[in-house]
From Swiss-Prot:
Disruption phenotype: Inactivation of the gene leads to glutamate auxotrophy and to the absence of any detectable IDH activity, suggesting that only a single IDH is present in C.glutamicum. Weakly inhibited by oxaloacetate, 2-oxoglutarate and citrate. Severely inhibited by oxaloacetate plus glyoxylate. GO terms for cellular component: cytoplasm. GO terms for biological process: glyoxylate cycle; tricarboxylic acid cycle. The keyword Magnesium applies. This is Isocitrate dehydrogenase [NADP]. It comes from Corynebacterium glutamicum (strain ATCC 13032 / DSM 20300 / JCM 1318 / BCRC 11384 / CCUG 27702 / LMG 3730 / NBRC 12168 / NCIMB 10025 / NRRL B-2784 / 534). Binds 1 Mg(2+) or Mn(2+) ion per subunit. Mn(2+) is the most effective cation in vitro. Mg(2+) can partially replace Mn(2+), resulting in approximately 40% of the maximal activity.
Length: 738
């Protein structure tokens, strides 16, 4: 039997799964397809690390490792929903919840000194940050706005904040001594096993990474961010935001960049509270309160210090004296610096641009902002859009073009695979990458506390990326632009390989060019304003940034993107949108039993997954399901049956009901497959007859508080009861499986 894997993840998409997946299972079964769940939630991944500490009933398999292997086979057909990329505070909260539920798992050690503690820390580090996507992404990325969604937005545009020509909003970024400026890059002419080592000024050698296996043709880079230069830059920006009377905000990616960015976040916190750290720094650092887990962790940790109240007062004075901070939650006093994972650059910058260049201040009012993006590799993209909006005003969703993306992602490409090669430097000296025969391939002078890192990209993914770009340009008729920076050593190497591999393809009649990220941004937004479309062909980080930036401006959200990963072994990975897992949506369910999560991303991914089954295995019924689902999705949009934000109006469960009805209607009416038409005729009839009652019942359950039985590890039975509250609807769906 053909199989589709549906991932069980976290937060809002997990809740939605309990409503939608029974429908998917029932419909897929009519085409001979089994839908199997694999648990890659944060809780599931934690438990998989400690099998020896669990009872037989509690043990779970390592679903992520199994899916990683499956992704390397032609049989893979995986639907991947958003999951938590855990920061340390989230990880600690999940551990505590699991312990309270009776799981004998250890605490996360803050300072691992014994072998046992080091082993525990290594296991938790495997779960921390963006631990899922790099394992599953054995292919490059093809993300685009489906035509149905684009058409819907033109009819029902989302709100775009007006821009003022006098806006003081800007991006602040380093102009020297950051990752971009210090990068060195090589292309290996033969396979090798290299070593990364640190040689201190006194001659002491430390092996940072003993064995890094590299293939022929692989691109390897090393670079370093100077801690002194970073601190000087940050102090300047704190003063600048204060002088200009605008909000101070930091935009990093502490989830995916789980080694470098929490360190940088700590520098930001210490720079903002420079006076507090000048006075109490030694004591704070000794207590592990260095800012890397955010201001909230510091304030919590102060409770165990004798003079904690005194230091807390100093932090409060620091907030009064410093520039106003951008707020995550004004009502609760949660600032941009409270939690490293609260403000993630790829989501926060487009949201700011969409909102007139404003973020929220402590009075819950919009205000101009200084957006701190310390490393300058990609900051210019956002500054270019800001300057364009200052000059030309906000974009118009009813007329603007689209910017699909082809992203280099496979096999942990570039920065998003750098975590195991990123190091905080302990002492002044040099870092060297040394070949097996002792040649120094890359070398940097370093100082204590600098962040040094290496990135790699294998040759096969680069070839596949170029091929995918040509294919998408040919199929769509759009120009394709490779976003590569001639000022960066890595990008210069990549550009030479792009030119080499483009020669392997028929590019006649295609418009394919290579531009710097700033030039490519300007070209793309000039074309957007003329209603023209342009494919952005980017590395891994810009894949992530652009597939939030352009969809948020075009569609109001990145969750409505079609995200396909053609796996290099021939399988398919279908990601549901490009957004996160929406913790605020869960909060609303807990308070009001209303889930505003929009499953449009799941609907789009599911149709592509069925289509993959048709194309790979000749399953024509799967193709009929896909076409009918696309039509049902378009009808859902046009009839405005997507979830509302307000309690008492349609929510995620209601939208699932209407999708099911429209899908059954389409299947009953189609003439390609008589069996499916006959199967779905009574289903459609039952859903149409009961529509008013089912819709009313789904609205009636809203309004009261709910108990999920856990946040990271909710109770199965409670979730099922909350997400499938109407027996009449459930019986119609479940009857299909019999």
């Amino acid at each position: 039997m053909a199989k589709i894997i549906w991932t069980r993840t976290d937060e809002a998409p997990l809740l939605a799964t309990y409503s939608l997946k029974p429908v998917v299972e029932a419909f897929a079964a009519t085409a001979g397809i089994e839908v199997e769940t694999r648990d890659i939630s944060l809780a599931g991944r934690i438990l998989a690390q400690f099998p020896e500490r669990l009872t037989e009933d509690q043990k779970v398999g390592n679903a992520l490792a199994e899916l990683g292997e499956l992704a390397k086979t032609p049989e893979a057909n995986i639907i991947k929903l958003p999951n938590i990329s855990a920061s340390v505070p989230q990880l600690k909260a999940a551990i505590k919840e699991l312990q309270d539920q009776g799981y004998d798992i250890p605490e996360l050690p803050d300072n691992a000194t014994t072998d046992e503690e080091k082993d525990i820390l290594a296991r938790y580090n495997a779960v921390k940050g963006s631990a899922v996507n790099p394992v599953l992404r054995e292919g490059n990325s093809d993300r685009r706005a489906p035509i149905a969604v684009k058409n819907f937005v033109k009819k029902f545009p989302h709100r775009m904040g007006e821009w003022s020509a006098d806006s003081k909003t800007n991006v602040a970024t380093m102009d020297a001594n950051d990752f971009r400026h210090n990068e060195k890059s090589i292309i290996l002419d033969a396979a090798d096993e290299v070593q990364i080592k640190h040689i201190a000024a006194d001659g002491t050698e430390t092996i940072l990474k003993d064995s890094l296996k590299l293939l022929e043709g692989e691109v390897l880079d090393g670079t370093v961010l100077s801690a002194k230069a970073l601190d000087a830059f940050l102090l300047e920006q704190v003063a600048r935001a204060k002088a200009e009377g605008i909000l101070f905000s930091a935009h990093l990616k502490a989830t995916m960049m789980k080694v470098s960015d929490p360190i940088i976040f700590g520098h930001v916190v210490r720079a903002y509270f420079a006076d507090v750290f000048a006075q109490y720094g030694e004591q704070l650092l000794a207590a592990g309160l260095n800012g890397e887990n955010g201001l909230a962790a510091i304030l919590s940790g102060l409770e165990s210090l004798d003079n904690g109240e005194e230091i807390k007062a100093a932090f409060e004075k620091g907030l009064e004296d410093g520039p106003d901070l951008a707020m995550v939650n004004s009502a609760r006093g949660i600032t941009n610096l409270h939690v490293p994972s609260d403000v993630i650059v790829d989501a926060s910058m487009p949201a700011m641009i969409r909102t007139s260049g404003h973020m929220w201040n402590k009075d819950d009012q919009e205000q101009d902002t200084l957006a701190i993006i310390p490393d300058s590799s990609y900051a210019g993209v956002y500054q270019t859009v800001i300057e364009d909006c200052r000059k030309n005003g906000a974009f118009d969703p009813t007329t603007m073009g689209t910017v699909p993306n082809v992203g280099l992602m496979a096999q942990k490409a570039e920065e998003y695979g750098s975590h195991d090669k990123t190091f905080r430097i302990e002492a002044d000296g040099v870092v060297q990458v040394v070949s097996s025969n002792g040649d120094v391939l890359i070398e940097h002078d370093v100082e204590a506390n600098d962040i040094w890192r290496a990135c790699q990209v294998k040759d096969a993914p680069i070839q596949d990326w170029v091929k995918l770009a040509v294919t998408r340009s040919r199929l769509s008729g759009m120009p394709a632009v490779f976003w590569l920076d001639p000022e960066r050593a890595h990008d210069r190497n990549l550009a030479s390989l792009v030119e080499k591999y483009l020669a392997d393809h028929d590019t006649e009649g295609l418009d394919i060019q290579i531009l710097s990220p700033v030039e490519a941004t300007q070209l793309s937004i000039d074309r957007i304003r003329r209603g023209e479309d342009t494919i952005s062909v980017t590395g891994n980080v810009l894949r992530d940034y652009n597939t939030d930036l352009f969809p948020i401006l075009e569609l109001g959200t990145s969750a409505k993107m079609l995200s396909v990963v053609p796996l290099m072994a021939g399988g398919g990975l279908f990601e549901t949108g490009a957004g996160g897992s929406a913790p605020k949506h869960v909060q609303q369910v807990q308070e009001e039993n209303h889930l505003r999560w929009d499953s449009l991303g799941e609907f789009l991914a599911l149709a592509e997954s069925f289509r993959h089954e048709l194309n790979n295995n000749g399953n024509t019924k799967a193709g009929v399901l896909a076409d009918a689902l696309d039509k049902a999705t378009e009808k859902l949009l046009n009839e405005e049956k997507s979830p509302s934000r307000k309690v008492g109006e349609i929510d995620n469960r209601g939208s699932h009901f209407w999708l099911t009805k429209f899908w059954a209607d389409e299947l009953a009416a189609q003439t390609e497959d008589a069996d499916l038409a006959a199967t779905f005729a009574p289903v459609a009839e039952a859903l149409n007859t009961g529509a008013a009652d089912i819709d009313a019942a789904l609205l009636a359950v809203q309004g009261g508080a709910t108990d999920l039985g856990g946040y990271y590890s909710p109770n199965e039975e409670k979730l099922t009861n909350i997400m499938r509250p109407v027996a009449q609807f459930n019986e119609i769906v479940d009857a299909l499986k019999k």
